[in-house]
Every structure is written in structure tokens, then in C-alpha cells.
């Protein structure tokens, strides 16, 4: 099948339309069920992480190898000769892109992936995270996990809990789900970490339902998806953090009234916002979600590097 993602830069979720998101999710399901080690044969993919990463880097590199491709790159850009010699990002991208067929990049600077796309000589840039801005491939694996567990991406009740102000994963997933029909959002956070105004304004303009809550227990019975995030300790003094943390810890007892189909997602790492007794419940899906990062990234790479599948 032909696809509009061929040779496309993957910089942010708003630049992907519904049909493209559905194509990635569908392809991820196919590749999870039927691995294809020929899709990236003779392809070289750069995996360039200018700040440390575990899940994103390893799942991308696993995806490339499972599809028959070759990976080059680095995991800590600050220790590379290009950083120590003061080479600009633009120059680094121009050089590295001349070696490869696709360029996966994480960078602490917001907007770095878009800048890279201007200097890559047409080689597709895939944003593995640029500061607090965007993390589109996390959103793709989140969508795949939701579809896998719910059988749909329309008609969902979805709650986001914790740090909704600084969490790039919740911003991107909200924007992605907004492209589907009849989505109801529940934003559960302390006022100081509430969903940014620009996200709420986008939802208002699109006529999408959302509500604000201080407690997750009041919304759990209504949910199909509960998306947990950690409250970041560095945002508070010790006493404030202790109070905030206690208000947003999910325990197994709190799931007594949850729908049978409700699944709990988390971008990881988990600190203490989900207690370990939740792991054995039928609702926990965050470790399977992390595994799905391989299949979602396989799908994306296959579509970006193959005009037809």
C-alpha cells in the first residue's frame, strides 16, 4: 500500500493526520503479529541521542535490527568529539545525514528536531524527544496500546493524572486523541501542575469535552484509559512534594469500581505513583505498553523508508 509517510520528517504530533496515525497503528499490529526482517534491508539508521535515554533508544535500535537494518550513532552526545570540538547541531546533522537513510534524534533543546530537518538534505528526521516540547513516537506507542486494549480510538474516556503542565507525553497524546471522535478527557492534577492553557484552548476550539479534577478516585469508574505520570520532585519543596505525591498515588484498592476494560498506562519510569500491588491487576498495562514501543517504532521506520508495504 502507498503511504503519505514515505520520506516524511516526524517532528510533532500535530503534523500527522488521523489517517497517518491509523496507518502507523495498523502497521504496528501487523509487525507485532508477523515480523518482517526484510523491510529495512540495506538501510542504515542513525540513532543520535544528545542526552541519555534508555527505553526510546533501545526500542528504536531493536526496531531497526528486527527489520533487517543497521544502526549507527551514540547515546550521550556530550561525550562525542563533535560536542567537545564545538561543532554546531546543523553541521553535525549535515554530516551524519550523508551516511544514513533515516536519522533518529533526541536533543535537550526545544525545536532541535525541526532545526535538524532543515539541514538533513532530505533524509527523514524522527524526533526522539526535544526538551519539553514533543515526543511523537511515545504518542504512537501509546495510541497502539490503547487500540490494542480497547479495539478502537474513537469513543473513549481518558484520564491523565499527575504532572500535566510539564509532561510532554500527555500534551502530545491529548493532541493525537483529539483527531478522533467522541473523546472525553479527564485532567487530574494539582492546580500548579494543571494542563497548559494552550491545550485546553485547542480542545475548546475543537469542541472536545474535558473536565478538571483534584482526585482520580472520582473519575476511575468512568474510564477506559487511566494515563499516570509522576509528580516531579524538583518542582516543589519537600513539604509540598510530600503532599502532592500522596494525592496522586494509585493503589490496587482504588480500582475496585473500575470498568473491566479499563487499562492503566504510564510512560515510565515509574517512581512511586503506582504501587506494586497494581502490577498484578488486570488493569495494569504499562510494561506491555513499553514493549509496544518496539512495534510502533518498527511501523514508523518501515513506513518512512518504504514507499509501499
Curated annotation (Swiss-Prot):
Name the UniProt key words of this record, in alphabetical order. Pyrimidine biosynthesis, Transferase
**Family from the record:** Belongs to the aspartate/ornithine carbamoyltransferase superfamily. ATCase family.
Q: How does it assemble?
A: Heterododecamer (2C3:3R2) of six catalytic PyrB chains organized as two trimers (C3), and six regulatory PyrI chains organized as three dimers (R2).
Q: What is its EC number?
A: 2.1.3.2
Taxonomically, which superkingdom? Bacteria
The name this protein carries in UniProt is: Aspartate carbamoyltransferase catalytic subunit
Its annotated pathway reads: Pyrimidine metabolism; UMP biosynthesis via de novo pathway; (S)-dihydroorotate from bicarbonate: step 2/3
Q: Which InterPro entries match?
A: Asp/Orn_carbamoyltranf_P-bd, Asp/Orn_carbamoylTrfase, Asp/Orn_carbamoylTrfase_sf, Asp_carbamoyltransf, Asp_carbamoyltransf_Asp/Orn-bd
Can you tell me which residues bind carbamoyl phosphate?
A: 55-56, 106, 135, 138, 268-269
**GO CC entries:** cytosol
What single Pfam family name could you report for this chain, choosing any that match? OTCace_N
Its GO biological process annotations read: 'de novo' pyrimidine nucleobase biosynthetic process; 'de novo' UMP biosynthetic process; amino acid metabolic process
Reaction catalysed? carbamoyl phosphate + L-aspartate = N-carbamoyl-L-aspartate + phosphate + H(+)
Q: What does this protein do?
A: Catalyzes the condensation of carbamoyl phosphate and aspartate to form carbamoyl aspartate and inorganic phosphate, the committed step in the de novo pyrimidine nucleotide biosynthesis pathway.
Residues the entry annotates as binding L-aspartate: 85, 168, 230
> What are this entry's molecular-function GO terms?
amino acid binding; aspartate carbamoyltransferase activity
